[in-house]
């Protein structure tokens, strides 16, 4: 087939990574899974990270789910984004786990969110449920860094959410907080609790939280670059 073989060495530079991603455009997940000898799950409910893991095998990513970027040598994070027939995102995009304790003195400039979003390789993937997983195709890639306006919106939301966490209001935060960035529970089950700060400054147990990009933000980003 015309696409890359799986498990290449890590890309040497941004251009090589982007060219690998371009070669995947138009391929189906079934073709790529067969080439990588990976079993295709029945659906993505229990295997949310499967598409990203599959693409990492063809792009040469090494970081896995560590806090660093997927391509740490290049400072690039890989984000797959399921889209509908009109090219609009079907779900929010996970950025990273939110720190709920030990946040004194933390700033936007040194935050995990900013680090993860400094340079992103976006790869759209057909995501409508009526398309069987194996038949869903990969779209054209996009290498992106936030412009000044996007960075300002992200910083403002991050600071607002982190202030609420530090002040002990984590349980009051809903997915409606934030213009482009939201904070919501991230746990496979409701028994996986983590320590946080309560309203009186006392330690409490709560669900782990994650930062997510809202669909309005990623939708505008894709539309601007692809003229969707």
Swiss-Prot record:
> Can you name this protein?
DNA mismatch repair protein MutH
Classify the source by domain of life: Bacteria
Q: Name one GO cellular component term.
A: cytoplasm
> What keywords would UniProt list here?
Cytoplasm, DNA damage, DNA repair, Endonuclease, Hydrolase, Nuclease
Q: Which organism is it from?
A: Serratia proteamaculans (strain 568)
State a single Pfam family of this protein: MutH
Q: Which InterPro entries match?
A: DNA_mismatch_repair_MutH, DNA_rep_MutH/RE_typeII_Sau3AI, DNA_rep_MutH/T2_RE_sf, Restrct_endonuc-II-like
Q: Does the keyword Cytoplasm apply?
A: yes
């Amino acid at each position: 087939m015309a696409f890359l073989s799986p498990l290449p060495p890590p890309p040497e530079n941004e251009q090589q990574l982007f060219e690998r991603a371009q070669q995947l455009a138009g391929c189906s997940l079934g073709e790529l899974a067969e080439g990588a000898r990976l079993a295709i799950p029945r659906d993505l409910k229990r295997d949310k990270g499967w598409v990203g893991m599959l693409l990492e095998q063809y792009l040469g990513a090494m970081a896995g789910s560590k806090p660093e970027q997927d391509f740490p040598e290049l400072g690039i994070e890989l984000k797959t984004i399921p889209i509908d027939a009109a090219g609009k995102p079907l779900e929010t995009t996970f950025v990273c786990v939110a720190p709920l304790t030990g946040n004194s003195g933390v700033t936007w400039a040194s935050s995990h969110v900013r680090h993860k979003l400094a340079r992103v390789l976006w790869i759209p993937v057909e995501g409508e449920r009526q398309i069987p997983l194996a038949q869903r195709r990969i779209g054209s890639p996009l290498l992106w860094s936030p412009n000044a306006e996007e960075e300002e919106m992200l910083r403002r939301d991050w600071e607002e959410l982190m202030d609420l966490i530090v002040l002990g209001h984590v349980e009051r935060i809903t997915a409606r907080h934030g213009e482009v960035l939201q904070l919501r529970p991230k746990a496979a089950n409701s028994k996986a609790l983590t320590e946080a700060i309560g309203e009186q400054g006392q330690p409490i147990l709560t669900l782990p939280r994650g930062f997510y990009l809202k669909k309005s933000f990623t939708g505008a980003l894709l539309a601007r670059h692809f003229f969707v």
